[in-house]
Amino acid sequence: MRIVGIIPARYQSSRFPGKPLVDILGKPMIRHVYERSARAGCLDRLIVATDDARIAAAVAGFGGEALLTRADHASGTDRLAEAARLLELDGADIVVNIQGDEPLVNHRMIEALVEALQCDRHCPMATLAFPSESLQDYNNPNVVKVVLDRGLRALYFSRAPIPFVRDGAADAPAFLKHLGFYAYSASFLQTFSRLPPGRLEGLEKLEQLRALEHGYGIRVALSPVDTRGVDTPEDLEAVVPVLAQDAVGA
């Protein structure tokens, strides 16, 4: 069994075109993601899956491995599934989905994610969550929340404030902020990519709900650190000072 980290990265973005190559402290963002992810001791291989030759060339330029995929994928998960097929992974291999716009990724997050998948044979995929009490995040529909059962399996993901406090407390309850990193068995990744989208997925615009709607369990690991993705130039401004303090993701 191999554990392969795949970083889906596309050049076109409606809110921030070319963001994988945007300079952060002298390096393209994709290099920060790659080098910080490479510190995860559990990974046997790390690859950037992209539809853009410029991104592939940038990755090769700093000594990383890149794989060109089709440009017509509807989601990063579909790109991931194609990459896994091109790599001819065994069904028992583990694929870790590391977002290409997460320059604050920490190797301990990846290690916790892989451990969670390996320890629960009833769940073919795993993801991460970070405990929070931020009222702003609790009420922000762009911050996805997750609730768990007692076995640390996801009951539901939502953009709405969950768990909802019926009695209207002024402060946010302790909740779990979902972090969009995933690990799958390679065989389930192909199964997932072929599943038809579900109604809840369509309403919430959350792809992971597809697994729950089709009856597949998702194990959730508590991340040792929080992170922040880069969707806009404003997000980039916020992550630069954090990276300046922790350039290697110690």
UniProtKB/Swiss-Prot annotation:
Lineage: Bacteria, Pseudomonadati, Thermodesulfobacteriota, Syntrophobacteria, Syntrophobacterales
Gene: kdsB
Pfam family, one: CTP_transf_3
Pathway(s): Nucleotide-sugar biosynthesis; CMP-3-deoxy-D-manno-octulosonate biosynthesis; CMP-3-deoxy-D-manno-octulosonate from 3-deoxy-D-manno-octulosonate and CTP: step 1/1; Bacterial outer membrane biogenesis; lipopolysaccharide biosynthesis
Reactions catalysed, as given in the entry: 3-deoxy-alpha-D-manno-oct-2-ulosonate + CTP = CMP-3-deoxy-beta-D-manno-octulosonate + diphosphate
Function recorded in the entry: Activates KDO (a required 8-carbon sugar) for incorporation into bacterial lipopolysaccharide in Gram-negative bacteria.
Enzyme Commission numbers on file: 2.7.7.38
CDD domains according to UniProt: CMP-KDO-Synthetase
Chief location category: cytoplasm
Location(s) in or outside the cell: Cytoplasm
Natural source organism: Syntrophobacter fumaroxidans (strain DSM 10017 / MPOB)
Family listed: Belongs to the KdsB family.
Name of protein: 3-deoxy-manno-octulosonate cytidylyltransferase
Annotated keywords: Cytoplasm, Lipopolysaccharide biosynthesis, Nucleotidyltransferase, Transferase
